[in-house]
UniProtKB/Swiss-Prot annotation:
Family label: Belongs to the orthopoxvirus OPG098 family.
Function text: Major core structural protein.
Protein name (Swiss-Prot/TrEMBL): Core protein VP8
Pfam families cross-referenced by the UniProt entry: Pox_VP8_L4R (PF04498)
Induction behaviour: Expressed in the intermediate phase of the viral replicative cycle.
Compartment(s): Virion; Host cytoplasm
Site (Cleavage): G18, S19, G32, A33
Domain of life per record: Viruses
GO cellular component: host cell cytoplasm; viral capsid
InterPro entries: VP8_pox_nuc-bd
Modification(s) after translation: Undergoes morphogenesis-associated proteolysis which cleaves the 28 kDa to a 25-kDa product. Proteolytic cleavage of major core proteins P4a (OPG136/A10L), P4b (OPG129/A3L), and VP8 (OPG098/L4R), which occurs at a late stage of core formation, is required for production of infectious mature virions (MV).
Keywords, comma-separated and alphabetical: Host cytoplasm, Virion
GO MF annotations, alphabetized: structural molecule activity
Length: 251
């Protein structure tokens, strides 16, 4: 199993939110397969944000964006190559806002994770899969744009035979197997880290405002795993208490 996912999910916990039913869909995955983006919980759903599109982009909003990203402290520490070094708020911010990252996928208010369908397993099928393992230290990061940014959608009636770069300093609402994700391009110049939250063993959130609080949280990992049903409840709690951007979309 990939080290990237080791502390995120159980061995059998695999979700697939990128089901490829047509060759055109395969091309769309290929169009973003080499993009550089910070890995997060969305990676376990096989969500690969695209940096190219074969559709015309339509401007739908110009506004400030607030979005969320779930991951674990192990994931960030491992990807930064920190080893046993302490993880700091500055390191977390540098990881997500590395200038090499071309795009950052964000969960927004109308991101519906109930659309996730567990991938069938030859051994068993558990609809209430583990999202964060016992012993892990998951965190919720809240990001906001530094200023108003143009938000686009793809005009699905304007397909071209060629892919073109989506471009920098813009956001694109995209759907991955029914899950709405807001992709922000050139995130290092357009967004900033606003807040970090940890998960208590009662499946509640606590704000981590200092490196001392972050270190204390990392020394008290989850005593029980967070399964899909609990995670969906946490996500709804986040939406009720944090004003995430809402971008209505038509199916």
């Amino acid at each position: 199993m990939s080290l990237l996912l080791e502390n995120l999910i159980e061995e059998d916990t695999i979700f697939f939110a990128g089901s490829i039913s047509e060759y055109d869909d395969l091309q769309m995955v290929i169009a973003g397969a080499k993009s550089k983006f910070p890995r997060s919980m969305l990676s376990i759903f096989n969500i690969v944000p695209r940096t190219m599109s074969k559709y015309e982009l339509e401007l739908i909003h110009n506004e400030n964006i607030t979005g969320a990203m779930f991951t674990t402290m192990y994931n960030i520490r491992n990807n930064l190559g920190l080893g046993d070094d302490k993880l700091t708020i500055e390191a977390i911010e540098n990881y997500f806002l590395d200038p090499n990252n071309e795009v950052m996928p964000l969960i927004i208010n109308n991101t519906d994770m109930t659309a996730v369908i567990p991938k069938k397993s030859g051994r068993r099928k558990n609809k209430n899969m583990v999202i964060f393992r016992q012993g892990s230290s998951p965190i919720l990061c809240i990001f906001e744009t530094r200023k108003k940014i143009n938000i686009y959608k793809e005009n699905m009636e304007s397909a071209s035979t060629e892919y073109t770069p989506i471009g920098d300093n813009k956001a694109l609402i995209s759907k991955y197997a029914g899950i709405n994700i807001l992709n922000v391009y050139s995130p290092s110049t357009s967004i900033r880290l606003n807040a970090i939250y940890g998960f208590t063993n009662k499946n509640k959130l606590e704000k981590l405002s200092t490196n001392k609080e972050l270190e204390s949280y990392s020394s008290s990992p989850l005593q029980e795993p967070i399964r899909l049903n609990d995670f969906l409840g946490l996500l709804e709690c986040v939406k009720k208490n944090i004003p995430l951007t809402d971008i209505p979309t038509k199916d």
